[in-house]
Amino acid sequence: DIKLFDRGFDFYAPQTFEDENGRRILIGWMGIPDADYTNPTEEAGWQHALTIPRELSVRDGKLIQEPIEELKQLRSEDKAVCTFCYGQTIIMQNAIYEAVVDFKRCREMVMTLREGITLSYKDNILTLNLGVYGSGRSTRKVRLEKLEHLQIFADTSSLEIFVNHGEEVLQQESTIIMEDY
């Protein structure tokens, strides 16, 4: 079977290297150079970005991509946002955040990652929906055996979503610039 490294919209030209501890690290370009959409960052004088560095490994015959441990050193404080209940919608309140969500027997959920952008799970399908902000690129879907864990990194111009401890990854360079609210 062929497996995509990243199920998101803008993953391009990944490069890997081995660090001094023997870890295989991947960094990709977050942006497609010949795409027919534009990003508001162009008005600010820049276009595209690099993904979060990902440590590559193999677990149970599957390629795993997890954010490097060093990112934990950048955290400033923990905030408990909510307890997730069946049928509840989670709405993230900031433009810049790292969210870690663990699920027990999740059958269905919806998260609003930012205004107009949702992540949903139903019938074993995880869907990232950009809505009107996708510039014609509206959804990405991935079939999962089950949803147990999400780790989401968001800043004012991108989202990176690590599913089930790196079994799947989705990223998106934003077609909108979010103000921290």
Describe each region flagged by the PLM.
Residues 5-181:
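Beta-rich accessory regions
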Residues 1:
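Active-site neighborhood of glycoside hydrolase catalytic domains
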